[in-house]
From Swiss-Prot:
Disulfide bonds: none annotated. This is Anhydro-N-acetylmuramic acid kinase. CDD domains: ASKHA_NBD_ANMK. One of its GO terms (molecular function) is kinase activity. The gene is anmK. ATP binds at residues 12-19. Belongs to the anhydro-N-acetylmuramic acid kinase family.
């Protein structure tokens, strides 16, 4: 792997904005040096959300979103560089994930689609950009996700300790770092996505701060069991999912079967859905000594409390304790994956994605010679 400074750019299924991180990366070291967050303008967020939920969209609108996101990513990167007092010449490459608008790994012809024009990112920043990370893995029969477990293994793996890394973003996913066993990782189900959507409808705020609203409600057992009966939760790995499946339509389908539930009780039940669907998968894999949590859901005290209660004997802690910011974990991972791509090294783990082989991920968008 070519040592240098890399920038990772991530906008996840929560659709809150763009996380950008600067890291010094070498073979054995990932050292975060700066970070920046640029929120999505509300109108842009709503347009992306409409596409992600399968609402009809014209090619003109899709192309416009692709271009606008590319420009927004470039703006976030330049703001990060200004904060760090660095120039484009100081950066080896950018790893830009893009915004997933559809992910369908189980169809007859599996595909995934991310937007955010990397040509614009490279042109506007003057920095070589690596993007389109997921489709090469899919071309070899994989799910195209999750890709972050390879990074988790590199930076959080332990020779003797059973560890599981849990990322609670819009979707929750786990990386199983078990000594002597090939790494596995997959999406467990909803993370913050349904919680945020339901909270927005009733409180018009982006998220339920620390789970305070959920704490005022009571879990509706009938609704919880109805949702947990969804076949996704019992499906074997490898598996991945997204907003195209676990969305407001999915929630209302289940609410129609259990009517007249108070809004705060729905929120409390969604917290329990997230926590139980995670805990069940931890237990299914034999448990662990440490559950290392990152992502926005790590700030939800209700989720963290329920995880600790559901997993007695497991230390539930934040990845920040190990020097890796939970807010920036995925952006760091794509900076690391960009470094691997630039060095012609594979970035996927077939034991995680189900691909038939390891492969170099992504496409490189070189900048013009200086």
């Amino acid at each position: 792997m070519k040592a240098g400074r890399y920038i990772g750019v991530m906008s996840g299924t929560s659709l809150d904005g763009v996380d950008v991180v600067l890291a010094a990366i070498s073979n054995k070291l990932v050292a975060q040096q700066a970070n920046h967050f640029l929120p999505y303008p509300q109108t842009l967020r709503q347009r992306i959300l409409a596409v992600c939920q399968g609402q009809p969209v014209t090619l003109h609108e899709l192309g416009l979103l692709d271009a606008q996101l590319g420009e927004l990513y470039a703006k976030a990167i330049m703001e990060l560089l200004a904060k760090a007092r660095l120039s484009a010449a100081d950066i080896t490459a950018i790893g830009c994930h893009g915004q997933t608008i559809w992910h369908e790994p189980e169809s007859d012809i599996p595909f995934t689609m991310q937007i955010g024009d990397n040509n614009r990112v490279a042109a506007l920043t003057g920095i070589t950009t690596v993007g389109d990370f997921r489709r090469r893995d899919m071309a070899y029969g994989g799910q195209g996700a999750p890709l972050v477990p390879a990074f988790h293994l590199a930076v959080l793996g332990h020779p003797t300790e059973k560890r599981i890394v849990l990322n609670i973003g819009g979707i929750a996913n786990i990386s199983l770092l078990l000594p002597g066993v090939a790494v596995k990782g997959y999406d467990t189900g909803p993370g913050n996505m349904l919680l945020d959507s339901w909270n927005w409808v009733h409180n018009q705020t982006a998220y339920d701060d620390n789970g305070q609203w959920a704490a005022t409600g009571n879990v509706n057992t009938q609704l919880l069991q109805e949702m947990l009966a969804d076949p996704y939760f019992s499906r074997s790995a490898p598996k991945s999912t997204g907003r195209e499946y676990f969305n407001t339509q999915w929630l209302h389908y289940h609410l129609a079967k259990v009517p007249n539930v108070f809004p705060e009780d729905v929120q409390a039940t969604l917290v329990e859905l997230t926590a139980i669907s995670i805990a069940q998968q931890v237990q299914l894999n034999g448990g662990c000594e440490r559950l290392l949590v990152c992502g926005g859901g790590a700030k939800n005290g209700q989720i963290m409390h329920r995880l600790a209660s559901l997993l007695p004997g497991t230390e539930v802690s934040l990845t920040d304790k190990y020097g890796l910011s939970g807010d920036d974990m995925e952006a760091l991972a794509f900076a690391w994956l960009a470094a691997r791509t630039m060095a012609n090294e594979p970035g996927n783990l077939p034991s995680v994605t189900g691909a038939s082989r390891e492969t170099i991920l992504g496409a490189i968008y070189p900048t013009n010679p200086r």
